[in-house]
C-alpha cells in the first residue's frame, strides 16, 4: 500500500499517521478529555474532522491496537498445515484467555521454518474489539486495510530505520514507551518482537514526584524534605 492511514484509538488520545507513496506525510492527534471513552459516533466524527482539517483524503486505514488490547508472543510449533495451525493456535494463548478462547481472534506471521518446526509471531485480540473498530471505520467512511498490535507497528518502524535490507544482519532493540500511567519497555530480538515489560510509575506520577507532591511521595515511601 503506497498510501495508507495508521490510526490508534487510545484512552487519552486519537493518533493518526498518513503515509503517502511510502513516506510519512502527516502525523496529528487529538486529546480525549479526562480519558473518557466516547461513543463510536463521536470517535468516528473526530477522525473525520481531523482528516478534513489536514486535507487528507485517503480511505485505507490500518488500526493499531493498544498494548493492553492484544496478546502477542513468539512461539515455536511443530510443522503443520494452516488448518491444523488454526485449531492449535488458541492453546498457545490459554494462559491469557482461559475459558474465553472462543471470544478471541487469532493471527500469525511465519518468521522461519524447517522440516520439523515453525517459528511464528502470533497474536490474539478480542472479537468484540475488532467489531468495534469495524463499526468506527464504517462510521468514519474508512476501509480497514488491517488491524495490528502496537508491537508489530514498532517492528515495522525498526525495520524501516534499519534500511529494510533483507540480507542485512538484524540487531536487538529495546524501545522505551513513556505513558501517563506506566512505562513500558518493548524488546526485539534480531528485529522481531520478543516481549514487553511494564514499570511503574508512569509519566504523570513521575511529574508529581519531581514536583514534590506530598501525597504521591508518601505513596512511594519517599520523604518530601529530602
Model regions: which residues?
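Gly/Thr-rich phosphate-binding beta-strand-loop-beta motif of the actin/hexokinase/Hsp70
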Residues: 1-30, 61-66, 160-205
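N-terminal phosphate-binding loop and adjacent alpha-helix
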Residues: 25-53, 207-210, 214-226
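Phosphate-interacting basic helix/loop segments used at nucleotide- and nucleic-acid interfaces
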Residues: 44-55, 158-171
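Conserved NTP-handling cores and scaffolds of large molecular machines
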Residues: 54, 97-100, 158-161, 210-217
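Short loop/turn motifs at secondary-structure junctions
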Residues: 57-59, 143
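Active-site neighborhood for divalent-cation/phosphate handling
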Residues: 65-163
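Hydrophobic side chains in well-ordered alpha-helices
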Residues: 132-133, 205-209
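Short, structured loop/turn "capping" segments at alpha-beta junctions
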Residues: 143-147, 193-195, 218-222
Amino acid at each position: 500500500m503506497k498510501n495508507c492511514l495508521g490510526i490508534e484509538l487510545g484512552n487519552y488520545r486519537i493518533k493518526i499517521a498518513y503515509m503517502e507513496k511510502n513516506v510519512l506525510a502527516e502525523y496529528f492527534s487529538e486529546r480525549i478529555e479526562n480519558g473518557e471513552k466516547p461513543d463510536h459516533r463521536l470517535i468516528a466524527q473526530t477522525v473525520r474532522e481531523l482528516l478534513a482539517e489536514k486535507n487528507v483524503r485517503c480511505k485505507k486505514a490500518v488500526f493499531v491496537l493498544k498494548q493492553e488490547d492484544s496478546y502477542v508472543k513468539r512461539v515455536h510449533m511443530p510443522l503443520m498445515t494452516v488448518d491444523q495451525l488454526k485449531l492449535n493456535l488458541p492453546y498457545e494463548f490459554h494462559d491469557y484467555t482461559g475459558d474465553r478462547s472462543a471470544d478471541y481472534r487469532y493471527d500469525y506471521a511465519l518468521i522461519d521454518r524447517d522440516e520439523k518446526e515453525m517459528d511464528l509471531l502470533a497474536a490474539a485480540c478480542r472479537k468484540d474489539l475488532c467489531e468495534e473498530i469495524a463499526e468506527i471505520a464504517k462510521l468514519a467512511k474508512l476501509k480497514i486495510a488491517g488491524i495490528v498490535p502496537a508491537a508489530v507497528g514498532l517492528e515495522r518502524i525498526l525495520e524501516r530505520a534499519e534500511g529494510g535490507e533483507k540480507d542485512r544482519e538484524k540487531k536487538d532493540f529495546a524501545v522505551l514507551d513513556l505513558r501517563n500511567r506506566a512505562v513500558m519497555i518493548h524488546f526485539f530480538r534480531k528485529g522481531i518482537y520478543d516481549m514487553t515489560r511494564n514499570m511503574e510509575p508512569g509519566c504523570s506520577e513521575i511529574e508529581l514526584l519531581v514536583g514534590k507532591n506530598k501525597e504521591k511521595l508518601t505513596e512511594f515511601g519517599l520523604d518530601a524534605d529530602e
